[in-house]
């Protein structure tokens, strides 16, 4: 079996077209997508949310805090592009996932996983400065900035505590064969849900190429073309090339 979870999430251009309808139907509205990998469903989802690069780093956003329960439920039932954040707010308030399922037809499985995130957020809020809770928060995919907001502190303070407690990510190899037979691919994902680092560090000089992220208005496949040629040039010069990206090319 596979020991990782992959999440693909669409990138919608409504930030460029604020007057366009954000309700989803059979008409294609996404310009691109992101792909994230984690050891748990919760970690993978929260990494995907951040990878969209639209200013959000959690499944709850300030926009929905002033909405009533009925407004949020009605809105989520209409399949808007941002209903994930409406669901996050409803679950944060303690609404029964079964009620949300009845209104939206979203599987209880997915709602229960979202509830795991919102429930732990409250537990984290009650345990400010706890190294054990910080370790679990990172395992569930919470970012340092989101933890800082929950604890009402600075991102630097969260980072310093992580360093002090040695709460660091490891890199796991993508197993494309589900352990059916031994394989090696130079394809890794970062996670806080493990202790063994599977990446092999060589003594060669290295150059990192940052990928352009999800396709959006004004940023398309021409950046992938540039990335490929950058990699070829780096290798031709005798360096080891490393790509960091939040979208599968």
Name these PLM-found stretches.
Residues 1-249:
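ATP-dependent carboxylate/acyl-activation modules
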């Amino acid at each position: 079996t596979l020991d990782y979870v992959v999440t693909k999430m669409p990138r919608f251009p409504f930030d460029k077209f604020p007057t366009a309808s954000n309700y989803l139907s059979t008409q294609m509205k996404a310009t691109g997508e992101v792909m994230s990998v984690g050891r748990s469903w919760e970690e993978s989802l929260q990494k995907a949310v951040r990878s969209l690069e639209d200013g959000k780093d959690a499944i709850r956003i300030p926009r929905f805090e002033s909405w009533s329960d009925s407004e949020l439920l009605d809105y989520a039932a209409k399949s808007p592009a941002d209903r994930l954040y409406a669901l996050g707010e409803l679950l944060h308030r303690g609404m029964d996932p079964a009620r949300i399922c009845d209104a939206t037809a979203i599987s209880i499985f997915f709602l229960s996983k979202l509830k795991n995130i919102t429930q732990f957020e409250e537990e984290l809020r009650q345990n400010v400065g706890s190294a054990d809770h910080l370790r679990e928060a990172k395992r569930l995919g919470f970012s340092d900035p989101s933890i800082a907001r929950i604890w009402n502190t600075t991102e630097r303070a969260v980072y310093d505590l992580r360093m002090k407690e040695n709460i660091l990510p490891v890199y796991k190899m993508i197993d494309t064969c589900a352990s059916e037979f031994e394989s090696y691919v130079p394809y890794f994902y970062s996670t806080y849900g493990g202790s063994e680092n599977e990446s092999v560090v060589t003594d060669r000089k290295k150059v990192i190429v940052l990928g352009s992220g999800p396709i959006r208005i004004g940023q398309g496949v021409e950046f992938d073309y540039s990335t490929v040629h950058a990699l070829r040039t780096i290798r031709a010069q005798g360096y080891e090339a490393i790509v960091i990206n939040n979208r599968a090319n």
